[in-house]
Amino acid sequence: MERARRLANKAILGRLVSQTKHNPSISSPALCSPSRYVSSLSPYVCSGTNVRSDRNLNGFGSQVRTISVEALKPSDTFPRRHNSATPEEQTKMAEFVGFPNLDSLIDATVPKSIRLDSMKYSKFDEGLTESQMIAHMQDLASKNKIFKSFIGMGYYNTSVPTVILRNIMENPGWYTQYTPYQAEIAQGRLESLLNFQTMVTDLTGLPMSNASLLDEGTAAAEAMAMCNNIQKGKKKTFIIASNCHPQTIDICKTRADGFDLKVVTSDLKDFDYSSGDVCGVLVQYPGTEGELLDYSEFIKNAHANGVKVVMASDLLALTILKPPGELGADIVVGSAQRFGVPMGYGGPHAAFLATSQEYKRMMPGRIIGVSVDSSGKPALRMAMQTREQHIRRDKATSNICTAQALLANMAAMFGVYHGPEGLKTIAKRVHGLAGTFAAGLKKLGTVQVQDLPFFDTVKVTCVDSKAIAEEAYKHKMNLRIVDKNTITVAFDETTTIEDVDTLFKVFALGKPVTFTAASIAPEVQDAIPSGLVRETPYLTHPIFNMYHTEHELLRYISKLQSKDLSLCHSMIPLGSCTMKLNATTEMMPVTWPAFADIHPFAPTEQAQGYQEMFKNLGDLLCTITGFDSFSLQPNAGAAGEYAGLMVIRAYHMARGDHHRNVCIIPVSAHGTNPASAAMCGMKIITVGTDSKGNINIEELRKAAEANKENLSALMVTYPSTHGVYEEGIDEICKIIHDNGGQVYMDGANMNAQVGLTSPGWIGADVCHLNLHKTFCIPHGGGGPGMGPIGVKKHLAPYLPSHPVVATGGIPAPEQSQPLGTIAAAPWGSALILPISYTYIAMMGSQGITNASKIAILNANYMAKRLENHYPILFRGVNGTVAHEFIVDLRPLKTTAGIEPEDVAKRLIDYGFHGPTMSWPVPGTLMIEPTESESKAELDRFCDALISIRQEIAEIEKGNVDLNNNVIKGAPHPPQLLMADKWTKPYSREYAAYPAPWLRAAKFWPTTCRVDNVYGDRNLICTLQPPQEYEEKAEATA
């Protein structure tokens, strides 16, 4: 009906325009007054000229309304929806800062020596409208083919419960949150992540788990690093069983290079510890080809030789298999993907790492712990944060920062929804389907089935595996070809009994099949040996046994969501985090089955839509950055840093410069840089900054020249984390190049570069991009993220590849000499790449350039508004800041006893998430607005900070107590305000409603200030019985 209406209007419009051509009194096409076909809202301009039409369409004379070509263009353009400041507001804000217009401000801020004249896309330059973008993505989706996947290898199709899909994965209340640094406004996702950790510890049989890692392969590499650290680097060999996934083996080999570890791949029977040099071993349980082995004696032997055992496992299998902890494993890693997270052509998925309490401080990634708040009530927080890379720098346990919190929450809710019995039912069904298939093959007699027990994957020996795979292909099924005579078939939650019947026909090789899966199923016996059957209960906490109906889970998800502040509520001005709009149109394709349901190792001809998108995205990113080739494999910013440095390392190695291992890092560089350099085996030299926050060029020159023979790289963030554009950045790059090094640029602050300058133009050789910052992938409460790396032509041959599906640079270099494998999937977290792709395509080159300009404008506007209340620590040569700036609170500690944390907690009462605290400079706040925040929102945040400064002034004047005041008492949750007794020296009303806008809508914290010290001293990282929480709260009170 709607389409017919549009066609009718189009025909009428054409007829009316045609009629005007025959009327000499009309000089341009015109329309009559609004009719029932063309409303008064029609985008045409009245000319004021009266005309007489040959046909009086509506009974009275009308004015001529000339047609504007611009008005005929589609109205659903995207930049005006993303960039919040109107042109009028831009001018007024620039004038407030002290410039006549926005461009004058940008000219004064970005150094002329590195400015681009303009940027032009080779595709989508004018920007697609939102409806055009959806149509384009639908076209790409139609080019993907969804086959039934029986490949396995750590990736399985899964039934994503729609209540979780709609209310978490598609819900901005969950996916626009930041990492839960402000625990008082993050209790919801902290509880969900604690559920995840509890689920992992229960199933693995080990007491400690983190809140997610990037993927199973990198989790195994982290475990290998742990083994090296446990042995204090004294044992330099790590053995990997050949029954591990090939991508895991390659990732570990790549990572081992940086630690100078020797990786040996061997059959289990050939493991040799006689050298005394083995720090750890890695085994798979179940194996990559499906076999189930009892590792009890193997682990005892390893321990007897002082060797740590890492076990890669499968959470669904562990619902019915003896847990690795009971077998004696020291560390367990794996992926939670098959717990309700789509395959997504490789990710994102939540990996995990579990271990014993003994190694808790060596664990990578975020860990959620139980603590208490200032009232003594239980509260959750991120535990042991002093392990993290921005604090310990090159001494950190890992460079991991953004992980996979959103996907961990989905997996946790999958466990909550199904509960222990539901999960066991799924596992037994999958195992039953595999067993039925194996029994049927034995009955057919055309192939040979492995004798070893299995869980979900059946190994088959045949005459011609390729012929069988091709037959399966005809039925839209993908099998794994191991070698010319071996094939494996992996079953999952979505497999049906009819699929098994189809597989019988495939493997019958033309022979009649005289039975069905249903007919032989009653004869099939459990294939799991009695010694490996799980007996230990799991998921016994009430949370996993209460929410098994959709209504109950919906309410539980909503209850947790209500505790968390997200971009749905207010701006999140965290410096170097770029919390910008995650537009609905950008997010929509992520959950389309045509993108979500493809196995990462499916033949590429089944993913032509993805491949076309990869090519387009690679070309667009090259245009934006000035680079020649991109790798999309790194699935986090920290992974991108590591990958970029490893590319530089491979380049030096290929030239015979094995000795080049010195990395210079300014103190103004991004916090993960030193940890990433350490992972690559580099020797780190730190250089300082001057009083204006710029890199001390003379100090850098001396460092480069003193290490000329061994210089590998410089890691630099641009603009710097001090919030300034280095005027001498081109000179800095030249110094490094003149001394034989390469320039690695951290892309954390790319939001201040796009369209104005570029890493390649400035002189960088390699740069990673945080797609979850500049390019709109949401932060998800702590992940997912993406960190693709762009390189100049001379580095392109060394971009990472993959052992299962060959990959490399986009566009591909003339020659390839890949450094190894960085992530478990060939193209990283491919499922979220459509988000960045649609953002770039819809913005067009002008819109995305304006985004950078407005981000800079917003930061300068806020800095100007705040400068009379707080010192702005660093500014550029013309007195401006970049897209972020640092507010100096250090004097307030002396005058009022106020720390950055106090200001951040009071901001919660005003409805805001605090800025980045005490980094990169201790005692400061780093503020980054983005282009998608309105002037009204910026003003509210500034008003809040100014109001807090006035509250601090009352302390300075001695009008209120130094320790008992509204700032030290913040935040103020409802339960505190509603208590029978109120002993504070300020009113409840002032505590709760310090600003007038809060009367209309207020976000409430759900806990008082959380005690960080108590949580680390009394470390609890799993759900405890409810009565224990109550007893602990009473004891604390």
UniProtKB/Swiss-Prot annotation:
Function summary: The glycine cleavage system catalyzes the degradation of glycine. The P protein binds the alpha-amino group of glycine through its pyridoxal phosphate cofactor; CO(2) is released and the remaining methylamine moiety is then transferred to the lipoamide cofactor of the H protein.
Catalytic activity line of the entry: N(6)-[(R)-lipoyl]-L-lysyl-[glycine-cleavage complex H protein] + glycine + H(+) = N(6)-[(R)-S(8)-aminomethyldihydrolipoyl]-L-lysyl-[glycine-cleavage complex H protein] + CO2
Q: Which organism is it from?
A: Flaveria pringlei
By its UniProt entry, which Gene3D superfamilies does this protein fall under?
Aspartate Aminotransferase, domain 1 (3.90.1150.10), Type I PLP-dependent aspartate aminotransferase-like (Major domain) (3.40.640.10)
Task: Mention one GO molecular function.
Answer: glycine dehydrogenase (decarboxylating) activity
Protein encoded by which gene? GDCSPA
Task: Using the UniProt entry, state which stretch of residues is the transit peptide.
Answer: 1-66
Per the UniProt record, which EC number(s) apply here? 1.4.4.2
Tell me which family the UniProt entry assigns to this protein: Belongs to the GcvP family.
Q: Which Pfam families match?
A: GcvP2_C, GDC-P
Q: Name one GO biological process term.
A: glycine decarboxylation via glycine cleavage system
Protein name per the record: Glycine dehydrogenase (decarboxylating) A, mitochondrial
What transmembrane ranges does the database entry give? none
Q: Does the keyword Oxidoreductase apply?
A: yes
What is one term from the GO cellular component aspect held by the record?
Answer: apoplast
Expression sites by tissue: Expressed in leaves, stems and roots.
Instruction: Give the primary localization class.
Output: mitochondrion
Give the InterPro entries listed for this entry: GcvP, GDC-P_C, GDC-P_N, GDC_P, PyrdxlP-dep_Trfase, PyrdxlP-dep_Trfase_major, PyrdxlP-dep_Trfase_small
Q: Which UniProt keywords apply?
A: Mitochondrion, Oxidoreductase, Pyridoxal phosphate, Transit peptide
N6-(pyridoxal phosphate)lysine modification sites? 773
Q: EC top class, in one word?
A: oxidoreductase
Q: What NCBIfam families does the database record attribute to this sequence?
A: gcvP, PRK04366.1
